[in-house]
Amino acid sequence: MPQLSPINGFVILCSISLMLLTLLINGHFMLKPISSLTTPKLKMAYIKKLYF
């Protein structure tokens, strides 16, 4: 059984990193309003207001 410990640690690290990635992606898309996603013109105006 001690031979499985590094493999288990690697699997745990991979699962934690995947959970963090999914949480980040979900938060990024949930913070955006749905109207800006459905209408690209408002999205472009918002991006221009941010960068210019």
UniProtKB/Swiss-Prot annotation:
Keywords of this entry: ATP synthesis, CF(0), Hydrogen ion transport, Ion transport, Membrane, Mitochondrion, Transmembrane, Transmembrane helix, Transport
Keyword Repressor part of the UniProt annotation: no
One of the record's GO cellular component terms: mitochondrial membrane
One GO process term, biological-process aspect: ATP biosynthetic process
Transmembrane segments: 6-26
Subcellular location: Mitochondrion membrane
Chief place where the protein resides: mitochondrion
Domain of life per record: Eukaryota
Membrane association type: Single-pass membrane protein
ATP-binding is among the record's keywords: no
Protein family per UniProt: Belongs to the ATPase protein 8 family.
Function in brief: Mitochondrial membrane ATP synthase (F(1)F(0) ATP synthase or Complex V) produces ATP from ADP in the presence of a proton gradient across the membrane which is generated by electron transport complexes of the respiratory chain. F-type ATPases consist of two structural domains, F(1) - containing the extramembraneous catalytic core and F(0) - containing the membrane proton channel, linked together by a central stalk and a peripheral stalk. During catalysis, ATP synthesis in the catalytic domain of F(1) is coupled via a rotary mechanism of the central stalk subunits to proton translocation.
Assembly and binders: F-type ATPases have 2 components, CF(1) - the catalytic core - and CF(0) - the membrane proton channel.
Protein name from the UniProt record: ATP synthase protein 8
